[in-house]
Amino acid sequence: MQDWTIEDSAELYQIHGWGEPYFKINDKGHVAVMPRGEGNGEIDLFHLVQDIQKRGLNMPMLIRFSDILADRIARLNACFVEAIREYDYPGIYKGVYPVKVNQQRHVVEEVVEFGRPFQYGLEAGSKPELLIALATLKTPGALIICNGYKDSEYIETALLAQRLGHTPFVVIERFHELTLLIEAAQKLGIRPLIGVRAKLTARGIGRWGDSTGDRAKFGLSAGEIMEVVAQLKAADLLSSLQLLHFHIGSQISAINVIKTALREASCVYVELAQMGAPMQYCDVGGGLAIDYDGSKTNFRASKNYNMQEYAYDVVAAFQDACRTKNVPVPTLVSESGRAITSHQSVLVFDVMGVSHLQFGEPEPPARNEHSIIRNLYETYTQITPDNVQEAFNDASQFKEEALSLFALGYLGLGERARAERLYWGCCEKILNLVRELDYIPDELADLEKNMASTYYCNFSVFQSAPDSWAIDQLFPIMPIHRLDEEPKARGTLADLTCDSDGKIDQFIDLRDVKGVLELHPVRPEEPYYLGMFLNGAYQEILGDMHNLFGDTNTVHIHLASDEPGEQSYRLEHVVKGDTMTEVLKYVQYDHEAMLESIRRETEQALRERRITLSESRLLLQHYERSLSGYTYLTNELQVELAAR
């Protein structure tokens, strides 16, 4: 039998698929990050985590790689430049970043900075996001796409922003907004830049398939678009209608769905131009997917196309439609937020403990033990590769009989415990044999998951990976070290919350979703770190404070190519995670009042001799220190490592 290699780990965790071109396994068996792509410098993630801990930041931590964000923006623009060249398209591409995908200030500021050479703009879906866009975007010629529900204040703010040199397009998504826009334009004496969102009949795919169609939340029907044109003509504002927008949903995994929508949208664009609107832009919305599982298929966690193919199809659709009708082609706009921000963030957390189902060789039953126990032991001894299905059926039947006998009072608690241990011992033996079979019977398919260990991890699913809980989103998860060792354990992940939903028990697989993750045994006095990858889109802003676990520590890393060696990076920003005082304040608790309440209670206990002076001092020290401390657990091993 060959020794385990890092290539075995790479294949197991599919890092060559979902990680391309930013993540790999290095010769040390650690995950390496290549923020600028293969061959342009790399960072050992395990060493980086150790370095950050030495600076006093504890687990869990979110690490953002600024260079990945810059590279994603550059790649997207390069793909459209190539598509425009390939099709001899007489127009340009101007992307916008949807602020809702990740509204964190450092992220938005970096998007604007890295997008400046490409006139990369911002998309706002609400009034607060519009305020962010106006305060952050200073790039001449960059677009601000104003989406979402709008009131008069929203629209007037967007119109007045033109006086500052911005290019804000107010996109009509509900017919009612047209009246507000016309009134605001007349009131302020500002000719607006107007877009309309079309409600396409082409359906999306997956969870967000209802973003289009007759019952879609946003957008105008064909009849409503005709009425918009008529009313704009009547108000002498048809010359302001310059942009068509559509959106068929997020994470579109199948390219044929995108092609169908593009054909329909390009026809709408041409018709608007022929109706007299001086159309100049088409915003194709989002949908550019991420390959979370590395399978390169149309599975919901993957995609069957690449970024270049996507750009080719967008350009080709409008080139063909406009040529056919002799209409000038539009400047192309996309809102590819997930594709831009997903790769840049890695959540790293440590394992706090493990619960195993391991039983070993059972002792033979005594002659006077109940027949159920003897039957279970006999089943255990007779398990072979040829009878695993029969043995499992027998063991399951005997276990059910044991539970019935216990409920009727014919079996004691100790005997029930013995029967359960024998049953799980049978399952363990069967599972070890099943793993070697070419074909696994359906009834035994769940055995791996049922026998899996539980790895208790220092993070909150609800705070750091809410989509995993809410919509069964799959994220690549793997150890960030020890990848030159075979991971012989099978486990699921449990978070710190007191909630049975606080777990991850679905993991990426090349052909399907698997119920367990291959992991290593946790060694005493040695940390075990796991990484959750591709979670830079939506997770931070959607995360909630279930059980009052707050934001994690966050660091921004920038590759410093002129500094060779393991320290070839800079910590650009450090954002400390929430303290207990901060999360308590969110739910209207005053930490001073809480501390004073404990002090009074302690003094009362001292007077009544229910607590000693040293105990009261220790309690108050713990209480006060906790108020200023991190909401997550502090592993004593973390403290020791940070001090080294």
From Swiss-Prot:
Coiled coil: none annotated. SUPFAM superfamilies: Alanine racemase C-terminal domain-like, PLP-binding barrel. InterPro entries: Ala_racemase/Decarboxylase_C, Arg_decarb_HB, Arg_decarbox_C, Arg_decrbxlase, De-COase2_N, De-COase2_pyr-phos_BS, Orn/DAP/Arg_de-COase, PLP-binding_barrel. Substrate binds at residues 282-292. The keyword ATP-binding does not apply. Its EC number is 4.1.1.19. Keywords: Decarboxylase, Lyase, Magnesium, Metal-binding, Polyamine biosynthesis, Pyridoxal phosphate, Spermidine biosynthesis. One of its GO terms (biological process) is arginine catabolic process. The modification N6-(pyridoxal phosphate)lysine is found at residue 100. Its cofactor is Mg(2+); pyridoxal 5'-phosphate. It holds the Pfam family Arg_decarb_HB. It catalyses: L-arginine + H(+) = agmatine + CO2. Catalyzes the biosynthesis of agmatine from arginine. Belongs to the Orn/Lys/Arg decarboxylase class-II family. SpeA subfamily. This is Biosynthetic arginine decarboxylase. The gene is speA.
